[in-house]
């Protein structure tokens, strides 16, 4: 089958699919100890809370409502309002439901953000995503619709006792310019 360039890019192996295959293999291997991604440290009390909540939703008919009805394009209004209220009350943020975007997870959220702020622009220029600290999460590597979407800088490496080390952003070497579409600061350690 012949795909478009988009299809070719998104049907080949990528960092995130390899990572997710490894996580899936670990979950299916008896006795494996999950020390990486994929929710490695589930909290029994939270699992019990979610099970109870789902049971209540099932008994009240809310599970069918949640699974079988479409929400608005921005997400479920009740959830957006509750999130905005929580962020205002807990953190003092001047935020409303219109400032919140719900996605299918962080991987798709970063895909949208990277391609919204970086890549080829209408004026012919190209902007990039700057990672001020590397190494970075492998799942980002294939998130651009175009190749060479990302740039990064080497960190300062602080050597610590017992063979440990810590990365620090080298603020003096950050290549921030007109071609910087966004700066992505993340430490996805679950």
Language model: regions and residue ranges:
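Conserved core of the PLP fold type I
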Residues: 65-190
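N-terminal "arm"/small-domain region of PLP-dependent enzymes with the aminotransferase-like
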Residues: 1-74, 89, 166-190
């Amino acid at each position: 089958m012949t795909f478009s360039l988009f299809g070719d890019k998104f049907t080949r192996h990528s960092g995130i699919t390899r990572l997710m295959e490894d996580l899936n293999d670990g979950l299916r291997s008896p006795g494996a100890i999950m020390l990486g991604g994929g929710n490695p440290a589930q909290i029994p009390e939270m699992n019990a809370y979610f099970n109870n909540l789902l049971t209540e939703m099932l008994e009240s008919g809310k599970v069918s409502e949640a699974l079988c009805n479409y929400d608005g394009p921005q997400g479920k209004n009740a959830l957006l309002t509750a999130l905005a209220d929580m962020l205002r009350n807990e953190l003092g943020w001047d935020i409303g439901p219109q400032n919140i975007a719900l996605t299918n997870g962080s991987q798709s959220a970063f895909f949208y953000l990277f391609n919204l702020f970086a890549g080829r622009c209408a004026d012919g220029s190209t902007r990039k995503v700057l990672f001020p600290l590397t190494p970075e999460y492998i799942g980002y590597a294939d998130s651009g619709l175009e190749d060479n979407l990302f740039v990064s800088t080497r960190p300062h490496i602080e050597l610590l006792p017992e063979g440990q080390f810590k990365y620090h952003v080298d603020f003096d070497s950050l290549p921030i310019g007109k071609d910087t579409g966004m700066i992505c600061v993340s430490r996805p350690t679950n």
